[in-house]
Structures are given as C-alpha cells and as structure tokens.
Amino acid sequence: MAGHSKWANIKHRKGKADAKKGKIFSRIAKEIISAVKLGGADQKNNPRLRLALQKARDANMPNENIDRNIKKASSADQEDYHEMTYELYGHGGVGIVVDVMTDNKNRISSDMRIATNKRGGTVATPGAVTFNFDRKGILQISKKNAIEEELFLAATEAGAEDFEVDNDVFIITTDPSHLYSVKDAINHLGFACEEAELGMIPRTYVECSVETAKDNLALIEWLEELEDVDAVYHNMKIPEELENE
C-alpha cells in the first residue's frame, strides 16, 4: 500500500490557507447544519454529523456554537446549503477543482467569474477536469500519536486503500464510503486523527515553470479566500523552489 505521497503535493497549500483565512469555524458550522438537515440531529445515526462534530472539537469550537448550529439547522428560516463543484483550467494546463458549499448560488457564480478575470484561468465544462481526479477519504495521523504496524493493520481491515508515510505523518486513503469506518477503527485503538475528510487526489500531475506555478498559486489562494469555498484541489506539481512558501 505504500507509495509516493499523492496528497503531500497539495495539502500544505490547503493547511496554510486554513490557518490564514480564519474560515475554519464558518466551514464547520456549514458542515454541521448540512449534516443535520440531511441526516438528523442524532449523531449516533448520522456519521456525517459525527465527523463534523469531531472537527468542531478538534478546532476548539465552543459548545454553545455547536449547539446553536444544530438548532439553526432545524429552523424553517435556515436556508439549505448546496454542495457544488466548479472545474477550472489554470495556467499551463493545470486542472483545478473547487468544492463549494453555499446558500446563494448566484453569489458564488459571480465570485468565480471575478476570480478568473482577476487571476486568469477559465471555467471548464463539467467533467473536463474531474475525470483526472479521484474523490477519496483522506486521514492524517501524526507519527507521535500512533504505532505504524497497529495503525496499518487496523486501517487495512477497516477498508483503507492506501497507507503512506510522509515526513511526520501517516496518510491513509479510503473509498469515500469507508472514511467513517476507518476513522472509527483508528480511534478505537486510541490513536487521534489530525484530519479526516473527503478530498480529491489527482491521477496525473502537470509540471510548470516557477513563474507559471506562482500564477496558479495566486489563483488558488484567491479562490480559497471566497466565502463559499470549502476546498481547492489541483494537479500542479509544485516546483521545489516554492514548496516551503
């Protein structure tokens, strides 16, 4: 199951943006509301809500915020959140996939047009970019919080597809339907998952010059700043000169 890290190429961009934006609570609130609307407020019977609540606790979201969002989801005045995926071509033929959760489709449509006008790139037809990505469950566990052999066996038995070691973390990928069962198996061992979420992993990567890569990263960061954007994925192989920026 081991191999080169398909996630490492993009995860540092996402993590950097999360820390910078201060959007974490807002995103988690939307996930809680959406999960309750789809599956009810009983987390025992709603794995999606259970994962959202774990994210809330990991992010130190106050309990009153969590309770307020659960109650908000049951209100008739609360608009439904729509999950959408935008596909873009960046600079140099790089494919970009944008996951959106919004209560205003017109707003995000306008925001996407402004982003491409300001930073370049074009909106692609549905399927033109995503065919080169696989949606997977992705879990990250710090090496200091787990024993590799025990983690590998538990994850494999629970349905994990891939197990990788990347610097100071173990990265486990699963079919989306097995994300919750693998996470529960890891938690049962007493190992803490630093991240457990659905994500898009490229099948192939595009190599770019440093300047083209900078243009793409500027576009990606602009997209990540948008209110309704949850995650941005790309298949650009980031030049070594930019990996730590």
UniProtKB/Swiss-Prot annotation:
Database matches in Pfam families: TACO1_YebC_N (PF20772), Transcrip_reg (PF01709)
Gene3D superfamilies found in the cross-reference section: 1.10.10.200, 3.30.70.980
Domain of life from the UniProt record: Bacteria
Segments passing through the bilayer: none
Compartment(s) of residence: Cytoplasm
GO BP annotations listed: regulation of DNA-templated transcription
Keywords, in A-Z order: Cytoplasm, DNA-binding, Transcription, Transcription regulation
Entry's Gene Ontology molecular function annotations: DNA binding
Cellular component, GO, one term: cytosol
PANTHER family found in the cross-reference section: TRANSCRIPTIONAL REGULATORY PROTEIN YEBC-RELATED, TRANSLATIONAL ACTIVATOR OF CYTOCHROME C OXIDASE 1
Protein family per UniProt: Belongs to the TACO1 family.
Identification of the protein by name: Probable transcriptional regulatory protein pc1328
Organism encoding this protein: Protochlamydia amoebophila (strain UWE25)
